[in-house]
Amino acid sequence: MVAFSALSGVSAVSLLLSLVQNAHGISLKVSTQGGNSSSPILYGFMFEDINHSGDGGIYGQMLQNPGLQGTAPNLTAWAAVGDATIAIDGDSPLTSAIPSTIKLNIADDATGAVGLTNEGYWGIPVDGSEFHSSFWIKGDYSGDITVRLVGNYTGTEYGSTTITHTSTADNFTQASVKFPTTKAPDGNVLYELTVDGSVAAGSSLNFGYLTLFGETYKSRENGLKPQLANVLDDMKGSFLRFPGGNNLEGNSAENRWKWNETIGDLWDRPGREGTWTYYNTDGLGLHEYFYWCEDLGLVPVLGVWDGFALESGGNTPLTGDALTPYIDDVLNELEYILGDTSTTYGAWRAANGQEEPWNLTMVEIGNEDMLGGGCESYAERFTAFYDAIHAAYPDLILIASTSEADCLPESMPEGSWVDYHDYSTPDGLVGQFNYFDNLNRSVPYFIGEYSRWEIDWPNMKGSVAEAVFMIGFERNSDVVKMAAYAPLLQLINSTQWTPDLIGYTQSPGDIFLSTSYYVQEMFSRNRGDTIKEVTSDSDFGPLYWVASSAGDSYYMKLANYGSETQDLTVSIPGTSTGKLTVLADSDPDAYNSDTQTLVTPSESTVQASNGTFTFSLPAWAVAVLAAN
C-alpha cells in the first residue's frame, strides 16, 4: 500500500484514519433490487501513433528509421563507426517497399571494427532480457559480424554477440542473432553493428531493414514491449480502438492509413508519413493490433477510412462514385480479417501466418467527421460505407464517427452507434455530468475520446473532473457502451499532445503513471453488470456517485470535486465488509510526472454496521468502495 503524499501538512496516517472515522454527513442508500444493465465493455483503450506511442513506444522494435522508409529517406539516428562512412543508397533496394539501404564505405586502410550505430528513439531500453537483432546485408564479405549494445557516453557494453557470415554483391542475405544482456541504468545506449575492417578494407557493404527487439509481451514475434503492455493489462480494459484517430485519416487520400501496406514481412511495409509530425514504420500493423487484442483480452474496434482526410486534406471529402474504390478497399480489408481460407483475402491472411479469421464485431466509419469540413458530406459517406459493409457483414456493429445530428443521416440505421468526443476543461467535464441522462436510448453511444486538456500533466482537479464525467456515463451505461481516455501513451522526449495517460522514457522501467491513469484503473477494475438506484439526502455536487453490482459484490464510485471533506454514510443491505480505494490530494494542482510522483491510491479495509459504511472523503478525491 502506498500512502498519500504532499497533503498540506496532513499526515498519511491521520488521513487514512479519517477515511473510516464515524461521521454524519451525506447519506447514500443503494437499492439491492432491480437496476439497469451496464455494458460489459464500458472501459477500454483508444490507440493511434501519437507521441511516439507506437514506434518508440509500445511496439517492441527499438531501432529508429530501420529501413530508411519514405520518399525522402534520411540517415536520422544512424552514424558510422571506425574507418568508414555511411550514405543512403537508392540504387540497391532491398524490396519495392524499401527502395533505399545504408551503404557502408570502408576506408582502404581500415583496421579494427567498422560499421554503423543507431541511437534508437531517444535511447534504447536494455532491460536485461534476451535480445534479438536481424539485418539484411549485400556486398562481398566473409568474416565476423558483431552486434553490440553499448553505453553512448560510458562505453559500457550491455550485450554483444559475434557471428561469421558470408555475403555477396549479387543479392541481399539476412542474418539474425540472439544474445543475453545486462540491464542498463538508463536509455543512453547505442546499437552497434560492425564488421572486421581489415577484411573489408576498400570495399562497400549495404545494410537493409535492421531490427532490434528485447523480450516481447507473451513472447509474441514482432510484439509489444512488456513493460507498457503490463501497465495496460493492469487497467483491465475491455476494448482497443485502432488505428486512430487522426492517424487513420492522413493528410490526403494517398496518405491515409492503408491496411494492406501494414501486413507481411517488415521489409514489405513501406510505412507512411504519419499525421503527428513523424514517419510511421507500420511495424505495428493490422496483424499486430489483433494480436494485441488477443493477448490482452480486448475487443477490437477497427477504424476504416471513409473518404475524408484531416482538415479536408488533398481532394477530400470524396463523395458519390469517387468513394467506390475506398469502399471496395474496406470490404477487402474485412474479408482479410473475417474471411475463411477459401476467400481471396482470407487466403492471403493465412499466408501471412494467421490461419483462423479474427473475431471482429465492431467497425467505426471514419474519424471525427464533424471537424475540418467533413460534416456536410458525412451523412452521404456514412450511408455509402454502411450500406456496403452491412450488406456483406450484417452482424457487424457499425459506428458513426460523430454524434452530431447535423452530420448524420436523418434516421440512423437500426443497430448502429454514434461516437462522442469531449476534450474539455475540468469545469467543462463536470458540466457534462448529466449529459447522458437525456439521450435517445435507441442509439448506443461510444465515447471514443475524452480527457481534460490544455495542461502538461494530468492533475488532481482534472482527474477528479474526469471521474465525475465517468460517473455520469457509467450511470447511463445501458446506452453508453464504451469509453476511452485519450491520448493513451507519451514518449516524454517527443510529445505532440498533452496531457496523456501514461508517460515513459527509454530508461528501463521508466514509466510514469498519471493521476488520470489511477482513476481509469480504479473504475475499470471495479465494475458491476447492473447499475443500482441510489437515494440520497443530498443533490449531486460537489460529491458525485454511481453504484453497481455483480452477484453479491457491490461497487460505489465517488468523486469529490471540491476543497472540503465530505462525510458519508453508504448503506448497502446485506454487505458486511469492503475495500476502500482512494486517490486524493488537498492540492488540486498536484500531479505525477517524469520528475515526481505525488499522488497514488491508498487502500483500506472497512467494516459495515448493519450494512452501513461510514467514512470521510478528502478534498479533491476519487474513491471506490468494493463491498460484499
Curated annotation (Swiss-Prot):
Domain of life of the source: Eukaryota
InterPro entries on file: Alpha-L-AF_C, ASD1_cat, Glyco_hydro_b, Glycoside_hydrolase_SF, Glycosyl_Hydrolase_51
Pathway recorded for this protein: Glycan metabolism; L-arabinan degradation
GO cellular component: extracellular region
Pfam families noted in UniProt: Alpha-L-AF_C (PF06964), ASD1_dom (PF22848)
Catalytic activity: Hydrolysis of terminal non-reducing alpha-L-arabinofuranoside residues in alpha-L-arabinosides
Glycosylation sites: N36, N51, N74, N152, N171, N260, N359, N440, N493, N610
Keyword terms: Carbohydrate metabolism, Glycoprotein, Glycosidase, Hydrolase, Polysaccharide degradation, Secreted, Signal
Localisation: Secreted
TM regions (residue ranges): none
GO biological processes: arabinan catabolic process; arabinose metabolic process; hemicellulose catabolic process; L-arabinose metabolic process
Record's signal peptide: 1-25
Disulfide bonds: none
GO MF terms held by the record: alpha-L-arabinofuranosidase activity
EC number: 3.2.1.55
Main function: Alpha-L-arabinofuranosidase involved in the degradation of arabinoxylan, a major component of plant hemicellulose. Acts only on small linear 1,5-alpha-linked L-arabinofuranosyl oligosaccharides.
PANTHER family recorded: ALPHA-L-ARABINOFURANOSIDASE 1
Entry similarity comment: Belongs to the glycosyl hydrolase 51 family.
Protein name (record): Probable alpha-L-arabinofuranosidase A
Species annotation: Aspergillus niger (strain ATCC MYA-4892 / CBS 513.88 / FGSC A1513)
